[in-house]
Amino acid sequence: MVEAPLIDTRAARLMAWFALVFALATDAAYLLLKGGQTDTAIYVFTVAFVACYLVVLAALLGASLMRRWSAGIRLSLRAGAAAGLLVLGVLAISSIGLPLLIAGAIATGATVRTLRGPFVTPSSLSAVAAAVLAVVVLVVGFEVSERAIVCPAHGSTSGGGTGLVTGPYFYDCINGQLTFHSGSCSSSSIDSNGNVTHPGC
């Protein structure tokens, strides 16, 4: 297998910079957006995960600009950041997805511009592995954080969602007590004893 000559061009570095700035700016906007929503306390772990994940992706792009790393390592760092930004952008398309897709596209451009010559090489395979790892971390992070519901100490509430792997679920919160159920349900009520019921589910 012939290794491709990797060239960290000025254009690739500028694109990595732009993607980094886009990612951090979107992260800041996301935190401001969530800070003004009433359900942020319930989903605090999901909000924290997304915010930290974006910081990590920005850090990967920043690290790819350091000349201490070989061009092959920079390629993998940019590929991982690009994949994470693109997939998160698709998942969050109804809120912060568009700027993330732009950042991901720019990071992808930086990745492609770093690679020259044959595409099936150890460096390109490492870049693919980095991209897959970034997506796996994103999926696992969502699966775990979405179920780490923080129930209010008093009162009752309910909600639900759909895991990327595990499928739909819904939950009940009563005076700080969390109960999970498999499947989907949009109907809930409180009986005379203060228990949550789901008629029709």
Show which residues each predicted segment covers.
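Cytosolic juxtamembrane helix and N-cap/initiation of the first transmembrane helix
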Residues: 1-26, 32, 59
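Membrane-interface helix-boundary motifs at transmembrane edges
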Residues: 5-8, 65-73, 115-124
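Membrane interfacial helix motifs at helix-loop boundaries and amphipathic/re-entrant anchors
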Residues: 27-50, 87-101, 141-201
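Canonical alpha-helical transmembrane segments
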Residues: 50-70, 110-111
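Cytosolic-side transmembrane helix boundary signature
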Residues: 104-130
